[in-house]
């Protein structure tokens, strides 16, 4: 069977279109969060930055209001990392990845758990969290008093991997970098607490927001395994393509796949964003030479999309009334690209530092 081959650049434009990065969307915040299958939210400000680059008219206050009124919530889901989900989605996503989270705890923390009983620790942790919200550090310290042979971190993470713990305000909202307060989802979101999401629905939703994609891409995003079973079950609903490296790619027939030469605007990303973390093959979002030059998981700066790919990193600093944005390119930029980065960078810096008096944007010269 001969399949149409899609280049990395074609895949890039398809991803940008679905991720609302070709043009800002007029979707509401909760609808955008749901469509994207949640936003990576390791740092307090990450979801705000990710949504500002995707939605027209986005404001800090609008997302904070949804966090406070419990329409969206931040908890550990895909890949064992923090994500911001809608209240309707959180339980379903968490239920699907629960086996992975429990296995991750066992692989990383069982040796640090001493001779303690997991069920007893879990029961004691639930009692503590039902009394009042706690930071992870305080939870581990409190449990250590009763379970002395375990390291505090192994105790608190056991609760985070076995219970859906939500990070609640006033922590983890814009500008608040303090240690997050945790509570059980049952103490924060309204019932029902059984909101099943099927693996087949997960595949459909992934393809809508990230396709065309391979089975390896899907599994990298969520850390579920054997999704080939669900893909086979959807065979009649999907179309197939082939990637440059010979992988079979799956997609929804009516999903957008723009031309490879579709113009792509400059966009600023948070430090962690599923637009590149949600794939096994990240060459749709980074040039080969840049992938070899930078380490996505060590000393990596938040990314800047230039002509659709992550082509630079950014740093924002503040000294009294002066806000400064410094952009470090990963390869040589054209003069036109520099002007585009400066223009979008000025708007981005004003979003990041609303109360500054002076704004400075500098695009550094590329240095090999």
Name these PLM-found stretches.
Residues 1-276, 280-282, 288-368:
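Long, low-complexity intrinsically disordered regions
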């Amino acid at each position: 069977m001969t399949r149409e081959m899609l280049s990395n650049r074609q895949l890039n434009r398809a991803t940008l279109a679905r991720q609302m990065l070709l043009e800002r969307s007029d979707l509401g915040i909760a609808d955008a969060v749901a469509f994207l299958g949640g936003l990576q939210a390791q740092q307090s400000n990450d979801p705000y930055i990710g949504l500002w680059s995707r939605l027209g008219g986005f404001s800090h206050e609008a997302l904070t209001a949804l966090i406070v009124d419990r329409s969206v919530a931040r908890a550990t889901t895909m890949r064992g990392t923090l994500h911001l989900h809608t209240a309707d989605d959180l339980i379903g996503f968490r239920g699907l990845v629960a086996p992975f989270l429990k296995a991750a705890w066992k692989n990383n923390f069982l040796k640090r758990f001493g001779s303690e009983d997991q069920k007893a620790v879990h029961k004691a942790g639930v009692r503590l969290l039902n009394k009042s919200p706690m930071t992870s550090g305080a939870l581990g310290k409190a449990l250590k008093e009763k379970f002395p042979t375990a390291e505090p971190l192994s105790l608190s993470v056991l609760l985070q991997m076995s219970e859906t713990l939500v990070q609640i305000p006033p922590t983890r909202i814009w500008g608040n970098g303090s240690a997050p307060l945790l509570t059980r989802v049952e103490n924060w979101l309204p019932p029902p607490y059984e909101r099943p999401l099927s693996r087949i629905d997960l595949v459909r939703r992934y393809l809508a927001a990230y396709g065309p994609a391979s089975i390896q891409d899907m599994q990298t995003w969520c850390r579920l395994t054997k999704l080939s079973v669900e893909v086979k079950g959807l065979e009649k609903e999907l179309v197939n393509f082939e990637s440059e490296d010979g992988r079979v790619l799956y997609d929804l027939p009516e999903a957008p796949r723009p031309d490879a030469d579709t113009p792509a605007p400059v966009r600023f990303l948070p430090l962690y964003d599923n637009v590149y973390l949600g794939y096994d093959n990240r060459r749709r979002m980074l040039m080969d030479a840049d992938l070899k030059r930078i380490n996505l998981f060590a000393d990596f700066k938040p990314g800047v999309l230039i002509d659709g790919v992550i082509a630079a990193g950014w740093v924002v600093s503040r000294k009294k009334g002066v806000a400064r944005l410094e952009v470090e390119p990963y390869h040589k930029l054209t003069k036109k690209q520099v002007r585009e980065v400066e223009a979008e960078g000025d708007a981005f810096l004003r979003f990041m530092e609303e109360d500054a008096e002076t704004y400075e944007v500098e695009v550094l010269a590329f240095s090999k």
